[in-house]
Design a protein with these regions (language model features):
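Long, contiguous binding/interaction regions
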Residues: 701-875
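Catalytic-core regions of core metabolic enzymes
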Residues: 2-691, 695
Length: 875
């Protein structure tokens, strides 16, 4: 069964195939000569050297065959480029659909394009698309001012001006492209479809995204994660940086997808330089590490120190060279080298840069190497550059050594060497700081990959939440016509999810408040209990440190008088009495809702000054402890949590558990619109929520998680016919080593039957594809027997109400019913998703599998390949 180990291409319209958009063999230009862009498109198409059939349909254009209309073409085009007046787009798409062409690019304005696509089934990039360039095919159906060269970089963009700027920069840096696609306004075919293609496009080594508008958050994150598992993905979103929570939530979504976010064109191009040339290290253990240990070597002390300073400013670490490595360096390098990181070579020894970089790259203590060359008399920079290019190429083989980045200084004299290094695939920069930024991009990419591999379950709390209590509180509020919970109700909800709250009592009358204070113990805090007071301190509705009944009654009288003046007509629900909390660090937790990415979690500095401090990190639910701890670490206030002078440290683990509780709450109750926990007061002895406010959505509305949780509820035990037990559960990223060992253990013939290839060792990228899956678009079950895997079963949605299956069982576990059970689990999952059929490919010589699938109801037939049979089952 040759199930692709990447995701199948989504085909959202009958007749549409993404190969027709991204690998067309027949292209038609339908262009109005009165539109200025038409001449640019025609010129680029004719000059591109397209390896397929190219036709001008309607108006003739030089350099391509002409047909008066689509009916005159011998075969339907795979792709049409429509440079027509707005009122001509709809009729043109009708004609395309009638002729059997279902992929189009629309460079100009096209009001109603989404409706045209829905009506005709034609998928279109646009409106205002830059066009599409596929340099390996010689296709340039774009508004570019120059032809991009072939290479490993892909660009999905919304801005035509930015696309031209990147193409121009790339030519100067000898960077080539596998694909450039202009999404335009994202009216129909958008980023998710393009990323789906790039996830399995072998020529693409790295992806650049120019983001402005995303239509479907879940599809985008799903596709971005699929792509980022196997190659770096870099994104920039201009016009929003640092301005609002929405921008921070966008950053969180990209991080969870494994995408590196950058700010501005300069950093965008810097990331392209690094990730377009450098393959991130695949050395064992590197994936989960910070990846920020940088070694610097230069032919002069000053530039090396500048690089070291830049690394430390960027939050990286200078790699520590172990004693045994120092001995090797002493033997290899000339006398007079600095002996520490940064390594400075003696004068006139610039040609030894390559040797030093190779030695450093091989060290397990080094994640990346920055090699710096400054102009020097009596040195041949071309020799040094050639040697470094060879060294960088050798370290890149196999992905086990740390990558080498170069800074070749000298604006006037070093241009030729930089060009030579770039031509040979070395990431080369003009300053030490820029090279270090490239190393930081590699480190952040590795951390993002680790974050994307985190798959929190729908159940991650140590205690079981009291969901029934929360449901009852919500029902009571809605019965009163309220969507706003009061403070007592909000604290009760948090307590139900294991978040510590301050001891408190709600009182309907002042006498009850005095009794509650006596029960809690003096001193106490008194608050007005109301769902209509989001900021009680601003209207004097809070009194602190009340030490007896008289003080409490006086405070209550003052509050009533103040509220009567400030908020006439307000009817409080009563009083909230809390034990006076000891001093501590005030923090804030938030749950909000983003129009694009749905529910989000925030953590940062609390208290009344929290909005001014603007010290908050954000992430998307579901969270686990690792993600929550990372959230805490991204704030400035986190540095104070570890202790400072007379402030004792606070437990980050306890705070992480509170964040996980808030995340679990968001997963369980999508009808919640917002929650604010402020302040949460943290001390060395523990923490307590002092105030909280929860808001429900209007009746009938519900939220939608951008990232689905790990489906832990699908785990089931199974006992084979001979009494052996396994647990069949959805596969997880941490199963990668187990899957690798499983494939090595299974007989070679069975592996060949499964992958149509005599594999014995799965490469890391393929292991990632097999174990880091999107449960919205595929399911893979693993049968766990102790600490090993006994079998795997997989089903990938094909976009046409079906899915493609694959099955592999360890020989020691065959004939016990495990294969039938796992296929049954796939069928149940498929039915639950509303699929109508499942299908797979079986080698004709695989008699055992053919008998098995026929026995469980599959029909088999010959495919176009005589060596392969198609097996299918209607559900």
């Amino acid at each position: 069964m040759a199930l692709p180990v990447t995701l199948s291409g989504r085909s959202l319209a009958p007749g549409f195939q993404d190969t027709h958009l991204f690998a067309p063999r027949r292209v038609a230009l339908m262009a109005d000569p009165a539109i200025a862009a038409s001449a640019v498109l025609a010129r680029n198409l004719a000059a591109g050297g397209f390896r397929g059939a190219l036709h001008a349909v309607g108006a003739p254009w030089a350099g391509m065959d002409h047909a008066p209309d689509l009916a005159a073409l011998a075969e339907a085009p795979h792709l049409a480029v429509l440079s027509l007046p707005p009122d001509g787009i709809g009729p043109a798409m009708d004609a395309l659909a009638a002729r059997g062409c279902f992929a189009a690019v629309v460079p100009g304005p096209a009001p109603g394009l989404a409706a045209h696509c829905a009506r005709t089934g034609v998928r279109a990039m646009g409106e205002h698309s830059f066009g599409i360039c596929i340099p390996p095919l010689g296709l340039n159906a774009s508004l570019s001012h120059m032809a991009p060269r072939p290479g490993r970089l892909a660009l999905l963009c919304q801005s035509s001006a930015l696309a031209r700027a990147v193409i121009d920069w790339a030519e100067g840096e000898a960077v080539g492209f596998s694909l450039i696609a202009g999404i335009g306004t994202n009216a129909d075919y958008g980023f998710a479809g393009g990323l789906d293609w790039l996830a399995r496009d072998a020529p693409t080594g790295a992806v650049l995204l120019d983001l402005r508008r995303i239509k479907n958050r879940r599809m985008f994150i799903s596709a971005a994660r699929a792509t980022a598992r196997t190659r770096p993905v870099v994104a920039q979103r201009p016009g929003h940086a640092g301005r609002d929570v929405a921008d921070a939530v966008m950053g969180a979504a990209l991080r969870r997808a494994g995408v590196l976010r950058v700010q501005g064109l300069e950093e965008f191009l810097s990331a392209a330089e690094t990730l377009g040339r450098v393959k991130p290290s695949l050395r064992p253990g590197a994936e989960g590490a910070r990846g920020d240990r940088i070694a610097v070597v230069s032919n002069g002390l000053g530039p090396g120190q500048m690089a070291a300073d830049a690394a430390l400013r960027g939050g990286a670490r200078l790699a520590v060279i172990p004693p045994e490595a120092r001995t090797l360096l002493d033997l290899a390098l000339p006398e007079g080298w600095s002996g520490e990181n940064p390594l400075a070579l003696p004068a006139g020894q610039g040609h030894r840069l390559a040797e030093a970089a190779s030695l450093l790259s091989a060290l397990a203590e080094v994640d990346s190497v920055v090699a710096i060359h400054a102009p020097a008399p009596d040195e041949d920079p071309e020799v040094a550059a050639a040697a470094l290019a060879a060294a960088a190429a050798s370290t890149g083989k196999g992905g086990r050594a740390a990558p080498v980045l170069a800074a070749w200084l000298g604006q006037y004299s070093a241009g030729a060497q930089r060009r030579a290094l770039a031509e040979r695939g070395v990431a080369v920069f003009t300053t030490p700081e820029a090279a270090v930024q490239g190393a930081l991009h590699l480190a952040q990419h590795r951390r993002n990959r680790a974050a994307a591999a985190e798959l929190p379950s729908a159940e991650v709390l140590e205690v079981t939440p009291d969901r029934a209590r929360v449901s009852a509180l919500f029902a009571a509020a809605r019965a009163e016509g309220r969507v706003q919970l009061d403070e007592a109700e909000s604290l009760a909800v948090l307590s139900a999810y294991g978040v510590p709250v301050i001891p408190h009592r709600a009182a309907a009358t002042l006498d009850e408040a005095v009794e509650a204070a006596a029960e809690l113990g003096w001193p106490v805090v008194l608050k007005v209990l109301s769902d209509a007071l989001p900021a009680k301190t601003e209207v004097g509705a809070v009194a602190l440190d009340l030490r007896d009944a008289a003080a409490l009654r006086d405070a209550a009288a003052a509050m009533e008088a103040g509220l009567a003046a400030a908020r006439p007509g307000l009817r409080p629900r009563g009083w909230m009495v809390q034990r006076q909390a000891p001093p501590g660090r005030e923090l804030r937790l938030r749950l909000g809702d983003d129009p694009m990415f749905g529910p989000w979690i925030g953590f940062g500095r609390g208290g009344t000054a929290a909005p001014i401090e603007a010290d908050e990190s954000h992430d998307l639910p579901p969270l686990n402890r690792a993600l929550a701890l990372a959230m805490i670490g991204r704030t400035r206030v986190s540095r104070l949590l570890d202790g400072w002078r007379d402030h004792l440290p606070v437990s980050r683990e306890g705070l992480a558990e509170a964040l996980v509780g808030l995340s679990q709450f968001a997963v369980d109750f999508p009808e919640v619109e917002a929650a604010v926990v402020n302040p949460l007061r943290a001390r060395p002895e523990g923490m307590e929520v002092l105030d909280a406010r929860i808001t429900l959505r209007p009746p009938g509305e519900t939220g939608f998680l951008a990232i689905p949780p790990y489906p832990a509820s699908l785990a089931r035990p199974f006992t084979t016919k001979d009494g052996r037990g396994v647990v069949v559960r959805p596969i997880r990223p941490e199963d990668a080593e187990g899957v690798a060992a499983f494939v090595r253990r299974v007989p070679a013939e069975d592996v060949r039957y499964r992958f149509f290839n005599p594999l014995r060792e799965l490469p890391p990228a393929q292991l990632a594809r097999l174990t880091q899956i999107d449960y919205d678009r595929e399911m893979a079950f693993a049968a766990i027997a102790g600490d090993s895997i006994a079998g795997t079963a997989r089903l990938v949605l094909d976009g046409q109400e079906g899915g493609e299956f694959a099955l592999l069982i360890d020989a020691a576990w065959k004939r016990g019913g495990l294969a039938r059970h796992m296929m049954g689990r796939l069928m149940d999952w498929a039915r639950g998703r509303g699929l109508r059929r499942i299908h797979g490919q079986v080698l004709a010589e695989n008699a055992g599998m053919l008998r098995f699938v026929q026995a469980i109801g599959f029909a088999t037939r010959r495919s176009e390949d005589p060596e392969i049979l198609e097996a299918s089952l209607e559900l």
